[in-house]
Amino acid sequence: MSSHITLIKTNTNNENKMTQFNYKVDNDVMIIRAMVNNVAKQMTPVWPLEKFIACNALHGFESMSFEEAVIQNQTAKKGTPFNEKLERVNWHMIKWCGSFLDIGQGTLEMPHRDKGLYFGFLKLAPFDSALHQNSKSIKSWLSNLPEMPEQAIRLCLDNLGVLNQKQEDFLQSTLSHLPGWAGYIKWISEWKNRNGKEENPVSLVDFIAVRLVITCILWPEASQEEKKKKKDSADTKQLIQNIKNKEDNYRQLLLKKLLPELSKAHIKENRANAQMVFCIDVRSEPFRRCIEKLGHYETLGFAGFFGLPVSIKDYDGETIKDSCPVLLKPRFNIHEKAIAANEHCIEHHEKGKEFKNILNRVYQQLKYNFSTPFALVESLGIWCGITMFLKSCSPIFARRLTKDLNEMICPSIQTQPVFELDLLEKEVGISLQEQIAYAEMALRLMGLTDNFAKLVIFCGHGSSTQNNPYASALDCGACGGNQGGKNAQLLASILNKIIVRRALAENGINIPQDTLFYGAQHDTTTDEVEIYHSNVSQFIHQDILAQLRTDLNMAKYNNNLERINYLNSIDCAEKDIARRSTDWSETRPEWGLARNAAFIVAPRQLTKNINLEGRCFLHSYDWSQDKDGTLLETILTAPMVVAQWINTQYLFSTIDNVAYGSGSKITHNVAGKIGVMQGNASDLMHGLPLQSVMSHDEQSFHEPQRLLTVVYAPREIISELVEKHDVLKTLFFNEWVHLVAIDPRNHLFYKLEKTNTWSVIQ
């Protein structure tokens, strides 16, 4: 085992041989890195719980057709028999990954983390008796491993007897045994660590090196066992056929609903009392229907980050959150300040916040100290027992009581974004020119360039749940798994500036002087809508605003009635939904984006009179204002791609919740504050929980089918855009997404074929 190390030592006296050896080592390093990069392409990144992002579980296979990718992955997973030695390797790998990647849950921190996973393993593995079983030869081998992970991979591949032509496949198989942990490491190295700055650096090269070292010790015949997999694709082919049948039925039903509405697509309405711009999220669709029925209101759909690639630091927060799609890199840093009306309680708020921080620090120190946890339980046990009783028996009352106590100690204050460019600290804020540019692009993308109402509400969204590790999965995906109200508030603040409006007028967007913009947030769990600063505003239209608040409450009630039918509850709708948002034992506070099926890019008039059952992403778009297709290009290459990620996550979590989901919430354990495991040692679960897609163990609630994109625009414009972008060719021609065009000139439906030709749908 140590021949490679010995070779390094015995050749130090021969300069020519040393040069040749160094060249060989460097060449090996490059070859290993190239192989790892190749196999990593098929790995799907796994985002941490705090910013849980929907992602296609087979993202790395999108270069294949949908059918080929599913067959290859499903048959491979079903063809892997139980292997006790493999399970032992997995157990040790989980132990090392959990220790290294922990971000504050563990009491003791793993040493040497700042030097990387492999380096830390190299220094500590000789002391791991569970791994080497006190074998002197294995301990000696561990102590003499190469310092570079690439060299360790080469050494282990040779020891395992993996043939050169099989090495890349073997490395692929090595990653596939723990795709969750490997995917999380890929996220760190390729998404989180975009600037190369990481406190505890880690890469898939480290991961593979550590795993292969463990494999050499515990499963030396691994390369032979990998050849014994059996594959059977018959069940998978039937699964794909069932998906196709659902897709065909849904497409016929949707197009049948749209057909009688085509003549209304370009009808211009009179000036509305209020316009509300919601996220394209499928949960917005039923609420939009409810509010439109209650008054002269117009609603629009737009990506929930409102076109602003920003990072936002909360008023009370110590961290900065990226509030834009993960496909984008934030360009601007924004922070918050208290509004003038809250000046009287700022001091009280700051003192209360400091008091709570002190209590929290003391509690954490007592809880995680070696000697004090028992004393902590003895002293706080009765109070914790009372709290547990209230949370379990009366969650709504417990939530209200907690909120009232928090208000007494640390009163909440309303804030506003600070977004003007700081001339001294140019990393903070947005320049005036960029404010104008982003405001114009947002208005044009949502089709709001004229006929402005007196009130325009930009409505982001978020959720409210208790004891839910997957809370961020219910928040706004377009905001990177964060709540979208702050983005809405920021865009409203920009558009309320007179200088911005004047610049927009020069570019053809005339906003009336009596138009006022507000930011708001829609709670998708309870359907409450909070309009920011509406109670302290000194502007006009208070009568319209008061009526809008009343109608929003009624829309909440009506939508609760509609949603409760899907939640299988016999209680009062409003009461039960309020309970779900506060009950810490509730495994299904809401259905999230389950049953999503279509992405419609069209004027609201086309869908306004249709009950789409909360299954459609709705993006407002008027092709007559976009003759060159520039706006449509942005919609198809950004929000539609995000919708496809969401759709495929729900699809694969439904068809195989063990392989692509995360199993039942009941047996979840949070691991290192980064993800969840099933039980005390499993792969890092990387999909949706069973309760997010299944009514019960044998009945799915989500209907697994690929995304159907419907675009109301001329076919030739769409064809040009598809040919222009590889991502669109991949998604449409490999049939990960279906595309239907509604030609506004003849009102016929056309389906895009693999050859970039169109066939009429009868």
UniProtKB/Swiss-Prot annotation:
Cofactor: Zn(2+)
Similarity field: Belongs to the inorganic carbon transporter (TC 9.A.2) DabA family.
Record's keyword annotation contains Metal-binding: yes
GO terms of molecular function: zinc ion binding
Assigned keywords, A-Z: Cell inner membrane, Cell membrane, Membrane, Metal-binding, Transport, Zinc
Species for this entry: Legionella pneumophila (strain Lens)
PANTHER family according to UniProt: INORGANIC CARBON TRANSPORTER SUBUNIT DABA-RELATED, UPF0753 PROTEIN AQ_863
Gene Ontology cellular component terms for the protein in this record: plasma membrane
Designated name of the protein: Probable inorganic carbon transporter subunit DabA
Known role: Part of an energy-coupled inorganic carbon pump.
Subcellular location: Cell inner membrane
SS bond partners: none
Domain of life: Bacteria
Membrane topology of this protein: Peripheral membrane protein
